[in-house]
Amino acid sequence: VVLVLVAVAIGAELYTRHLASSKVASAVQCEIQDSASVSFAPSPPVLWQYLNSHYTDISVQTAGNQVRSAKGMKVNLDIRDIKLSDTSNSRGTIGSLNGTITWSADGIKQSIQDAVPVLGKFVTGEVTTNPGDGTVQLKGLLDSATVKPQIVNNGLSLQVVSLSALGSKMSTTSVQQHLDELTSKATQNYPLGIHADSVKVTSTGVEATFSTSNATIPADSGGSTGGSQDTCFSNV
C-alpha cells in the first residue's frame, strides 16, 4: 500500500510539473516566438504549489533562435512569487520577473540583413563588438556604421554613432529609423510591464537586462489572437 501511495504521489508530481511547465513555456513561446524550456525550484513540490495556486520560483530559457523578428536573441527569465487567482480582468499576480536578453554578433548581422534589407550592405562583412567603448561596428564592402546599444522607450535601441556610406544616399536619420523599427519590434511593448533596465556590449554581442515587479497577469480577452499581452499569458 505504501509503495502504491508513493507511486501515485510521484506520478501526480510529474504530471503536474509537466502541465505547469507546458503552460509557462507556451506563454513565453507565444510572446517571444521561440521555443522555451522551463524548470522549477527543487522545493516545495510543484504539486503542492499547484494545489495552492502559488509558484515560488520558475526559470525559463529560450532556444536562442530569435526574439520576435530579431535573430540570434536568447532570453533567460527568473520568475518569482506567482499567485494565481481568477477575477474578471486578472489571472493573478507575479511578484517579480528578472530577465536577460543576449544578442549575438552574428544574430545582429542576420537580423539587419533579414529584417532591414535596405541596410544589408552595411553588414556584408563582420560585426565587431567593442566592450571598451560600448559600441558595435557594422562593416560592409564600402559602407560601415558604428552603433551604440542604449535603452530607449523601455526597450533596446541601436543608436547610430557614425556612418560611412560611400556612394550611398542614405543618411544617419534614415539608418536610425530602420534600426529603431527592428529593435522596437523585438524588445518593446512586452506584457506585464516588462521593461529594459540596462544594456552592455560584450565580447560576443549585446546583453540587456529586463524586469517587472508586482505585475498583474491579464485575463483572456476572448477575441484577440497570439502575440498580445491579453492572450499569451492568459492561460497560465
PLM region spans:
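Hydrophobic membrane-targeting and insertion signals
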Residues: 1-50, 220-236
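Short secondary-structure junctions
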Residues: 28-36, 116-121, 188-194
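N-terminal beta-strand/beta-hairpin edge segment
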Residues: 35-118, 122, 127, 131-135
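Solvent-exposed coil/turn segments that connect beta secondary-structure elements
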Residues: 43, 63-65, 80-82, 141-143, ...
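A short, surface-exposed beta-strand/turn
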Residues: 75-85, 149-154, 223-236
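Soluble extracytoplasmic domains of inner/organellar membrane proteins
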Residues: 102-176, 180-184
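Extracytoplasmic/luminal low-complexity segments enriched in Pro/Gly and acidic/polar residues
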Residues: 173-236
